[in-house]
Amino acid sequence: MIEINNKIDYIFYTNNTPNTYKIQLILLELQKEYGITFESRFINVFKKENYSDDYIKINPNKKVPAIVDQTGEKPFIVFESVSILIYLAQKFNTFLPDFKTNPLENSEVITWTVWQAANLGPAFGQYFHFSFFSPTVQEYSLHRFNNEAQRILRLLDDRLSSTYIGGNEFSIADIASAGWLLYLNSAPLYNATKERFPNIFKWLDLINQRESIKQVNQSISDGFKNFNPSLLRALFTNDPELINAKAPIGIENVILKYD
């Protein structure tokens, strides 16, 4: 049963993946600046806890992240990572310019926040899946999503000729992309991409100084050490040969195939 804790401002449903890291980041930022309290509740998708009747009441889409805002007269649920980012940014009037006073800046930040969810996240998710988690080599999929990942990184590197993704200030546009791009801090991906995308790594060096980013970087590092691809495959197939197969590329070679 999903229990409500009225002593906590926000309940945060997570499973330590890129989209949930976005929400961890903004909650940590709000905790530092405004003293909010939040409680993280891990949803084990490998045990299909996201399909439980209790969790479906939180998120009928059966995915993470989700939050329950307990600061009002009654608990209010928000799911989908970008929706949560916009909700919290608007509520605290931070990391997102106010539309009434700065409509153009507001639109620019929202545009790049939504861009992440529509482009960066899906492309990187598919590329990592077929290169690291897929039990068989699928050259077409690898080629397609490798090319798309390159296109997105080139676009973002051009964009980051400015200081931050959404403009001149740190915003939810940076938080949204950080959930995925902080993985580039890991040694194999760092070595493969740093020289090719200097502005992205200049941006990473800048945001890596934030305490919230440092905490999420540690979570990502721990995840690399502990994750077993077979657990993910078991969500999609019952074939033991596919579940236990060796990854076709492996994390050490991800994003190395440049045309």
Swiss-Prot record:
<dbReference type="InterPro" id="IPR004045">
    <property type="entry name" value="Glutathione_S-Trfase_N"/>
</dbReference>
<dbReference type="InterPro" id="IPR004046">
    <property type="entry name" value="GST_C"/>
</dbReference>
<dbReference type="InterPro" id="IPR036282">
    <property type="entry name" value="Glutathione-S-Trfase_C_sf"/>
</dbReference>
<protein>
    <recommendedName>
        <fullName>Glutathione S-transferase domain-containing protein DDB_G0274705</fullName>
    </recommendedName>
</protein>
<feature type="domain" description="GST N-terminal">
    <location>
        <begin position="7"/>
        <end position="96"/>
    </location>
</feature>
<dbReference type="Pfam" id="PF02798">
    <property type="entry name" value="GST_N"/>
</dbReference>
<dbReference type="InterPro" id="IPR040079">
    <property type="entry name" value="Glutathione_S-Trfase"/>
</dbReference>
<dbReference type="InterPro" id="IPR010987">
    <property type="entry name" value="Glutathione-S-Trfase_C-like"/>
</dbReference>
<comment type="similarity">
    <text>Belongs to the GST superfamily.</text>
</comment>
<dbReference type="GO" id="GO:0004364">
    <property type="term" value="F:glutathione transferase activity"/>
</dbReference>
<dbReference type="Pfam" id="PF00043">
    <property type="entry name" value="GST_C"/>
</dbReference>
<feature type="domain" description="GST C-terminal">
    <location>
        <begin position="102"/>
        <end position="232"/>
    </location>
</feature>
<dbReference type="InterPro" id="IPR036249">
    <property type="entry name" value="Thioredoxin-like_sf"/>
</dbReference>
<dbReference type="GO" id="GO:0005737">
    <property type="term" value="C:cytoplasm"/>
</dbReference>
